[in-house]
Structure formats: structure tokens, C-alpha cells
């Protein structure tokens, strides 16, 4: 009898330990999921519009779109994309304001130029997970071609002034340059092209004073 009681007590203790462990794991799982939410941030509601800022000037600026503050933006720096409801807004970049119309499910970059008014540039999202995308946003006053630094291979065919061009390529780290015909205009900072990402080269300025800058994070839906 004593042996049976002892066995019963041992089984009961094991059961309590198992229940306690299960309860502990259950309690731990709640903050774990909460942590995931904090880590990845809120999900954009269906029909949202997405906008970021690229500061092409040599001075830090503050930026906002409507009531959405996009924080301080360093010289030649950019923000991550922020989402908001579609609609008409006033964008403020530094001391300048510009009206913008933002459509649902569209991506945009607001460019703060070194001189002149800010510009709103649409950025179609890139969805190919196997390739990289090189996109050229040519906001300058001349047609330009993006080639390998040695000029032997065209990466993005000639892009007209105020135009856009792009090409999907395999992921690679590459040194590139801008050409006006066969004449090299300027080298471009090397960029590491990642699978499933778009590297967007913004070219601002005019004449012989051009400023090519890669703007990342990329336009990508994941």
C-alpha cells in the first residue's frame, strides 16, 4: 500500500511539473508574439500609399507629408518608406512646401533638390525575387547612359533628361559610370546589388555638375 501511495505521489508531482511547464511556455508565448509585432512594425492597410524622401541637398532637412513626420534627413540621405491613406497632401521639405497627390498602392520618392522645388517621383515596386533591379531616375538636363566603369557594357540604355530607365540583372557588386555617348561624365559609387531588391540611382544637378546617388532602402514588396 505504501508503495502504491508513493508511486501515486510521484506521478502527481510529475503531472504538476508538466502542467507548470506548459503554463510557463504559454505565458512566455504572449510576449514573444508581442515582440514580433514590435520588431516588424504595423502592417499597411489595404489601399495605402507609400512615400519616402531623398535629400539631394548639402544640408540636413526636416520632412513631413500631411501629418506624417518623416524625421530629419541627412545630406544625400533618404528615409524608409512610410505608408498613409491615399489622397492630396502638402509635403514639407525643409523650408519648402509642395502639394502632392498620392494614389493607393503606389510608391513615391519626394526629392529635395539642391536648387529648385521638390519633385515627386513615382517608384514602381520590384517583385522579382530572383534578380536585382537597377533603376535610373535622371532628373538632370542631359541624356545619360549607365555603363560599366570601363565603358564596355551598357547596364541601362540611354535615359533622356527628366526620364527613367531600368534593367533587371543578376545580383553582383559592380562599379559603374555615367556616359554621354562615348564620353565618361562621372563615376558612380560601387553598389552591392541584392537578390529581390531595386537599387535606384538618382541623378540631380545640371551641365557638368551632376550628382549621382544610390537611394536605398529599395522599392520592394516582400
UniProtKB/Swiss-Prot annotation:
Keywords: Alginate biosynthesis, Periplasm, Signal. GO terms for biological process: alginic acid biosynthetic process. Pathway: Glycan biosynthesis; alginate biosynthesis. InterPro entries: AlgF. GO terms for cellular component: periplasmic space. It holds the Pfam family AlgF. Belongs to the AlgF family. Residues 1-34 form the signal peptide. It is found in: Periplasm. Its main location: periplasm. This is Alginate biosynthesis protein AlgF. The gene is algF.
Amino acid at each position: 500500500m505504501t508503495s502504491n501511495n508513493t508511486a501515486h505521489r510521484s506521478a502527481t508531482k510529475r503531472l504538476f511539473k508538466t502542467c507548470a511547464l506548459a503554463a510557463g511556455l504559454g505565458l512566455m508565448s504572449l510576449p514573444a508574439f508581442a515582440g514580433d509585432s514590435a520588431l516588424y512594425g504595423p502592417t499597411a492597410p489595404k489601399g495605402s500609399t507609400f512615400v519616402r524622401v531623398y535629400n539631394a541637398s548639402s544640408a540636413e532637412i526636416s520632412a513631413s507629408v500631411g501629418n506624417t513626420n518623416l524625421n530629419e534627413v541627412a545630406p544625400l540621405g533618404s528615409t524608409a518608406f512610410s505608408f498613409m491613406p491615399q489622397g492630396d497632401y502638402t509635403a514639407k521639405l525643409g523650408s519648402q512646401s509642395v502639394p502632392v497627390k498620392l494614389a493607393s498602392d503606389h510608391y513615391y520618392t519626394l526629392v529635395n533638390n539642391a536648387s529648385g522645388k521638390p519633385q515627386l517621383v513615382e517608384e514602381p515596386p520590384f517583385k522579382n525575387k530572383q534578380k536585382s533591379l537597377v533603376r535610373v531616375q535622371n532628373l538632370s538636363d542631359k541624356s545619360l547612359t549607365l555603363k560599366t566603369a570601363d565603358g564596355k557594357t551598357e547596364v541601362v540604355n540611354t535615359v533622356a533628361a527628366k526620364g527613367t530607365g531600368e534593367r533587371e540583372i543578376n545580383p553582383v557588386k559592380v562599379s559603374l559610370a555615367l556616359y554621354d555617348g562615348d564620353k565618361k561624365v562621372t563615376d558612380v559609387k560601387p553598389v552591392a546589388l541584392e537578390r529581390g531588391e531595386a537599387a535606384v540611382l538618382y541623378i540631380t544637378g545640371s551641365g557638368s555638375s551632376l550628382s549621382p546617388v544610390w537611394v536605398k532602402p529599395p522599392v520592394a514588396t516582400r
